């Protein structure tokens, strides 16, 4: 029963991760399923789809087509849509319905590539995992589909800078501006990367890891093509309300590991000497964790963790976490889209 949430909403699913990870690329995104799963992406998890809304399509498979397994109707519609929408390649994300009826993704890829003449990637997402699993999977598929040996250039790839991982447009712009002082070309996979940029991914001097989701891909690129990687280091804006902090007080940062680790680094740089811990409801890399850090499985884990740590003077996290207490002085609101979605972020 540990996965029964009584006070928190369900977390962003793997297909939301796929859609968010590639929504700014020059690709046609197809989310295959019925209205319920689609609503989770379009109304809760997708904060930036307005920029490329015309390239995100939902099949909204009907009950009769589900029962009869009528894939042909949907495939024909995808082909027609691909003729009207500019794109370099197609990515299809699954949901619980395709899983239940046993959709043959390999056949879909084969038929759509033959009919459209464009590369096609099918993601066997089911909605049972959280968003970062979808991001990891689609990044690896992009590497598998488009990577090839090319001549090295003075360029850099930024991978994992998605809105579900806490990256805003301003944050991306600042990181790119800093990197442009050192490199001739800076390619953010979350900023209109087309097929030409992806096919040159192995020409990079270095890859920048913007979230934990990027780790498997950058490690594969290092292993296969010798492209090193480093963690994104961007000077983050001061957390609103941080001025109330006692510099010797204990602080808990709840959120995506790369960003929260950067906040921790900045706290220490600014003279904070108290205990600073990072925890997250989504994947964390053990190598980046310090004593007291924790990967949380759900709200019961969070309550247990706060008790084990005897609470903190200050907690920085999504507003929905304030109800659990665990802080002696102040709770600072830093919304996490993958946790609360539009519920609080639109306010």
Where on the chain are the PLM-derived regions?
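An N-terminal assembly and electron-transfer interface module characteristic of large anaerobic redox
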Residues: 1-347
């Amino acid at each position: 029963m540990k996965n029964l949430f009584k006070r928190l909403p369900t977390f962003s699913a793997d297909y939301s991760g796929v859609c968010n990870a590639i929504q700014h690329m020059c690709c046609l995104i197809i989310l295959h399923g019925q209205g319920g799963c689609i609503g989770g992406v379009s109304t809760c998890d997708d904060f930036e789809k307005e920029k490329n809304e015309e390239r995100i399509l939902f099949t909204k498979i009907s009950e009769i087509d589900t029962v009869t397994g009528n894939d042909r109707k949907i495939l024909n519609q995808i082909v027609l849509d691909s003729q009207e929408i500019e794109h370099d390649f197609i990515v299809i994300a699954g949901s619980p319905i395709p899983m239940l009826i046993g959709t043959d993704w390999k056949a879909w890829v084969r038929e759509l590539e033959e009919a459209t003449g464009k590369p096609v990637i099918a993601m066997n997402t089911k909605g049972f995992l959280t968003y970062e699993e979808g991001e990891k999977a689609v990044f690896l598929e992009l590497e598998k589909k488009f990577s090839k040996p090319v001549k090295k250039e003075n360029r850099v790839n930024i991978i994992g800078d998605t809105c579900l991982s806490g990256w805003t447009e301003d944050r991306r712009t600042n990181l790119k501006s800093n990197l442009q002082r050192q490199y001739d070309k800076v390619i953010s996979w979350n900023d209109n990367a087309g097929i030409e940029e992806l096919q040159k991914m192995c020409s990079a001097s270095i890859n920048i890891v913007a979230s934990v989701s990027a780790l498997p891909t950058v490690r594969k690129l290092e292993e296969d093509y010798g492209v090193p990687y480093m963690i994104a280091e961007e000077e983050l804006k001061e957390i609103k309300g941080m001025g109330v902090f006692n510099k010797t007080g204990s602080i808990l940062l709840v959120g995506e590991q790369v960003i929260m680790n950067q906040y921790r680094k900045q706290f220490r740089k600014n003279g904070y000497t108290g205990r600073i811990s990072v925890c997250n409801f989504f994947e964390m890399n053990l190598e980046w964790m310090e004593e007291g850090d924790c990967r949380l499985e759900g709200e019961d884990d969070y309550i247990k963790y706060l008790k084990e740590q005897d609470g903190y003077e200050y907690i920085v996290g999504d507003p929905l976490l304030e109800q659990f207490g665990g802080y002696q002085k102040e709770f600072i609101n830093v919304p996490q889209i993958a946790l609360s979605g539009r519920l609080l972020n639109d306010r």
